[in-house]
A protein has these predicted regions:
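Single conserved hydrophobic/aromatic residue that forms the stacking wall/gate
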Residues: 2-9, 13, 570-580
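Conserved interdomain linker/interface between the two RecA-like ATPase lobes of SF2 helicase motors
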Residues: 77, 87-173
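Conserved C-terminal RecA-like helicase domain
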Residues: 1, 155-157, 163-255, 283-288
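Conserved segment of the helicase C-terminal RecA-like domain
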Residues: 296-321
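Conserved helix/coil segment N-terminal to the catalytic DExD/H
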Residues: 6, 10, 14-26
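Conserved RecA-like helicase motor core of SF1/SF2 enzymes
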Residues: 253-254, 263-296, 300
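SF2 helicase catalytic motif II
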Residues: 23-56
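C-terminal accessory/interaction regions of large nucleic acid-associated machines
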Residues: 414-572, 577, 581
Length: 581
């Protein structure tokens, strides 16, 4: 079994395993790629709980874990967690090339490269690496313009000059910046340069056709790719993303401009990585993510060294601001500052303990409230507390089901969860103990079984659904309405219009189900998007509507089928119960 950081893939694997004992009984080796991806992000907490589940089955099969990471400073914690020993760690410092790191400083007139290299044989400072040039005046233009004249143009110019060492990857923090920098890079390409030639014509044709089908003839995805400028962001639909990533592996583009969706998902052969920013959607990226992306430099397999640069715009800033930003960049460039891999489940428990304390609730009382499902008494923001518990509840129920062949005993928890990552790392904190972690888990499982019942058949039904418990229960409550809608459709003529109406009516019923409303991005054109999507209209037509890309790629391609599958499972169980009666 090979797991990597693709959210949908991990969820699909988890759901398949929970509902298939034959697969579970065969697992002997689990390989976790990008194993450092643990923490407080929702999907990371869910993944951590999944690994806790896997441990049960792998141990029962006499199997092993192999965790891989290039940025893991506390490997011993994870070794103890997955192998019951801190000694099962193998470290290798080999790289396919040397590493050179530095700051790409733009002062409004020139780009200076300030390298952090300790190698005395090479210059640690390349002044005026790029100098701005006057641009010819256009008719009736009075103001003199230069190139580069802003940070994006400076980054594009630097990447263009560094292309002679091999492909360059430019990391950007938000989706719209991908094309913004691509447009500036396009200006750097000289008319006399040879046309970019694709080595694998089949891959190029597949990508081009997918783009035209999805975005239309004039899409910028194709326009830039023709020039060796490969762009990648989270807006890519899978029909385009897959051939694009295949194309990236087979070609040597001039430049790749991407958000972190590419940096952690695809192994790239690039010589240089330039960070246009150290922020992602307004928040600082972690030092762990920084080095995971930076580690792509020097993988073109023809490099003596991989170059890593962080862009720094010092125009119109005072000295204090400039120095503060330089220190921040230097902190990222220091590998000893890489973030530890930490248990998101432990942080969740600490957070709820803190929330309770702020509301004057002692930990013992918090435990009682969790066991009795009196969540509304913990904090006024009931939905937020429930959302946090939803991240771990189905995983806890799955483990409780596996450890209880008969009955509803909690005796297994002490021996099992003393080997959990949350318990192991509790020793590093003063505000939580390992025993409190165990008490929390026992109380939460009591609350879960009180909420869903103590019948194993119910546990197994909820666990195999793969969605959070609260959402599963909400769907079950709406089952009679869904049955009525389906029955009306069954006696209809089953035309395309009636099928579209069927989906619309079901969506209206489940609109307030947690997992539906959490993921759904509304649009004034939702009816038109739904109709065109189900009618097989070209994606290039659909994407013209508001939020169409997210609605199709996230909602109709992933989330909605997931919810419908759970609804079908409940319907089937309902039919079985009805026949038994």
């Amino acid at each position: 079994l090979h797991l990597c950081d693709r959210r949908q893939r991990v969820m699909c694997i988890r759901d398949s395993f929970r509902s298939n004992e034959d697969i579970l009984s065969c697992i002997k080796l689990v390989i976790i790629d990008e194993g450092h991806l643990l923490g407080t992000d929702k999907r990371l907490i869910v993944n951590e709980m999944f690994y806790e589940e896997l441990k049960y089955h792998v141990k029962a099969n006499g199997g092993r874990f192999l965790l891989l990471s290039a940025v893991l400073p506390n490997a011993e914690d994870l070794s103890e967690w997955l192998t019951d020993s801190t000694d099962n760690v193998y470290k290798e410092n080999w790289r396919p090339s040397d590493e050179r790191i530095g700051i790409m400083e733009w002062n409004g007139v020139s780009v200076n490269l300030n390298w952090k290299s300790t190698d005395a044989e090479r210059n640690s400072f390349n002044p005026n690496f790029i100098m701005r040039q006057k641009l010819p005046k256009k008719p009736k233009e009075r103001i003199m313009h230069y190139f580069p004249e802003n940070k994006n143009q400076a980054i594009a110019s630097t990447a263009y000059k560094l292309r002679k060492f091999g492909p360059v990857l430019i990391f950007v923090g938000i989706k719209k910046s991908v094309f913004a920098i691509a447009r500036e890079y396009e200006k750097c390409i000289q008319p006399e340069e040879q046309k970019f030639r694709f080595r694998n014509k089949a891959n190029w044709r597949a990508f081009k056709l997918a783009c035209i089908e999805s975005y239309g003839e004039d899409t910028e995805w194709v326009k830039f790719a023709k020039q060796g400028i490969f762009c990648h962001n989270a807006d890519l639909i899978s029909d385009v993303r897959i051939p694009l990533e295949r194309l990236m592996r087979s070609e040597k583009p001039r430049v790749i401009i991407a958000t972190s969706t590419l940096g952690q998902g695809v192994n790239l052969g690039v010589s240089t990585v330039i960070f246009s920013t150290l922020y992602q959607s307004g928040n600082p990226i972690t030092k762990r993510d920084f080095w995971n992306i930076a580690g792509r430099a020097g993988r073109a397999f023809v490099d003596h060294e991989g170059k890593i640069l962080v862009a720094h715009d010092i125009t119109k800033k005072d000295e204090n601001k400039i120095n503060w930003e330089r220190k921040m960049i230097s902190a990222y460039l220091n590998k000893s500052n890489i973030d530890r891999a930490e248990s998101g489940c432990l942080e969740l428990i600490r957070t709820l303990k803190t929330v309770a304390q702020l509301n004057g609730i002692a930990f013992d009382n918090l435990i009682n409230l969790l066991a009795e499902n009196r969540i509304n008494e913990i904090d006024e923001s009931l939905d937020e507390v429930n959302d946090l518990l939803d991240l771990i509840d189905d995983g806890l129920l799955s483990l409780h089901n596996s450890n209880n062949f008969e009955g509803n005993t909690l005796e297994w928890i002490d021996s099992y969860f003393t080997k959990s990552l949350a318990y192991i790392q509790a020793q590093y904190y003063e505000d939580i103990t390992g025993d409190e972690v165990l008490d929390f888990i026992k109380a939460r499982i009591k609350g879960i079984t009180k909420k869903v019942g103590i019948e194993k058949s119910i546990w197994e039904s909820i666990v195999s659904s793969g969605i959070p418990i609260n959402s599963d229960l909400q769907i079950d409550e709406k089952l009679s309405e869904i049955i009525s809608i389906v029955q009306s459709y069954i006696v209809s003529d089953k035309t395309l219009e009636e099928r579209i109406s069927l989906l619309e009516n079901i969506e209206d019923v489940i609109r307030d189900v947690n997992i539906y409303k959490e993921k759904f991005e509304d649009s004034v054109d939702i009816k038109e998007i739904r109709k065109k999507w189900l009618s097989g209209i070209s994606m290039s037509d659909i994407v013209q509507h508001e939020n169409a890309v997210n609605i199709v790629t996230q909602h109709y391609s992933f989330n909605m089928p997931w919810v419908l599958t759970v609804s079908y499972t409940h319907l089937r169980a309902h039919e079985t119960r009805r026949h038994l009666v």
